[in-house]
């Protein structure tokens, strides 16, 4: 989300996208081409290969203080150099979402329960050349929504899952002027709780980063950093892919399943006659890496908006039904001309007045461009002891535009960092969030 965005996502385990480290927090969360401390285990495991010695880094922060007063986020990272055999590391994340109130079906309070999320990752990184490296994370995550299901729900409101991160880093390109990197994080199977049929994809994210060494003097260093990222999750709303005016109605082999002329809700009849799934779904990761760049504008057809009746259109802009012969108006039954999908006069709207027929034409490539999240940061070091930082986090779809500020201190083997997110409280839940990090090299 980095930490703030991706609110538009239909992915699960979004807590994995919360950005750790006060240093990153002060630089607009731009970090994957920097990755030169223990937090590289999170940002880009490829960065660990360039580190010498060992380092331990941690952060504790009160999370989303504008929304809740009992949420906390903790992060701990470690790296260890194996000299000619590369580097190892890892990190632990714990997000405590606080106490929730349990009620019965009639709204009576039954007590409280805890909600929390945690993950642990192991990292390995090795040099490809003197100036390039690759890295890998293997992680396990546990999400605990509640201690038991509610009402008639079957199953458990918690899940245990796994995932992987892959990173590449190139140092000192263009005569030492530029570092650049790419990572693909949170690659893994879908996540489910109560109902496996409603499983959400992992928050798989592709990032590209650049670190420009604008000033490299003995006592003065200035770096300008830029990251751009995209959630590579291809999720589709209920849509009419084949243009027959219906969402689904057939099984995977093309056998029809209509009841009174309307697609059945029975499981297995989510397809059109060509075998394409038309109900809400998402692509598997091996497809989503590619289709996530076009799913919001090029792929799919007219959407079944909001009421999800499986019918595309059928009502005119005044709310008049155009497909039933006998209708009741002011208590009287009247006969009207029946119009089928595609006929002149067939209503383009649904019962709620939302345009459905032809709404696929309203999507454009800008829908995809607007899903990109941009992070810009600047960091000035004096004598490798004191740093001043600034940055900007921009997420168009999530309606987030947040300036960030921070500073860092290094003394002997100890480090302290502070990061501050400045934003309007009504637009960014991270407004006025202050992050503090400590590190120790040994």
PLM-predicted stretches and their roles:
Residues 4-442:
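Subset of outer-membrane beta-barrel
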